[in-house]
Amino acid sequence: MKRLFGRVVAEYAEFLFYAWDDERQEVIGVGHAIPAAWDGDRATLPDGGFDAAMEARFAPEPSAPTVLCALGITIAPEHRGQGLSRRMIERMAEIGRDHGLDTLIAPVRPTLKHRYPLTPIDRYLSWRRPDGTHLDPWLRTHERLGADIVKVASKSVIVTGTVAKWEEWTEMALPESGVYVVPGALVPIEIDRERDEGVYVEPNVWMVHPPLRVTEP
């Protein structure tokens, strides 16, 4: 996937954008997206989520794009919680509209899911605050912009590596085969020492934003 993501940056730079802090003269946010083909049927959104969106776009004969698929928004820690994420999503949707792609879809990575790695993602999605808004702040931000939670992308990101690599990445000893909860992961990883392999299969959440239309003055 790292190879394909490099192609996203190189071949779809028009869908890459930044948030800039004039006072500090530095980038404080980055957003990237990719055109995608989707027929509007919620059932056809792929379980592969993030990975599937890139694989489909770089297939030998990709289908003509009909929507814009968000791949990620990253905001500097000191600028989080100030409304920038909302503005970044809105800007992403505007860029899509400017290229004839009025609908934004997103395989969203829930911000707080890593605190509940043993909770099934479907159950996590049912958690709401007393005011009815979603417990997860990133899902909540998308919902406030009109997006619907459509389905779970159960295999959105798959990461494999040797046991040694996983011990390096997690800064943990993984002495035997089995399932481990590791820092930052939304779900546990699975270690197979006989095969010298660790696998992480991350679920994300497909969300669909309503078509963005131009408002006449």
Cite the ranges covered by each PLM segment.
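Conserved acetyl-CoA-binding loop of GNAT-fold acetyltransferases
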Residues: 143-151
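A short helix-loop-beta-strand connector motif used in the catalytic cores of GNAT acetyltransferases and
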Residues: 7-18, 36-42, 134, 198-205
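ATP phosphate-binding glycine-rich loop and adjacent ATP-lid/helix-beta elements
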Residues: 139
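Conserved acyl-donor/pantetheine-binding loop and adjacent beta-alpha core of acyl/acetyltransferases
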Residues: 31-72, 110-135, 153-197
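Short, basic/aromatic recognition patches
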Residues: 1-7
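Conserved acetyl-CoA-binding loop-helix of GNAT-fold acetyltransferases
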Residues: 75, 81-98, 103-106
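C-terminal/domain-terminus segments
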Residues: 4, 87-95, 99, 152-187, ...
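Conserved beta-strand in the GNAT
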Residues: 18, 25-35, 69, 74, ...
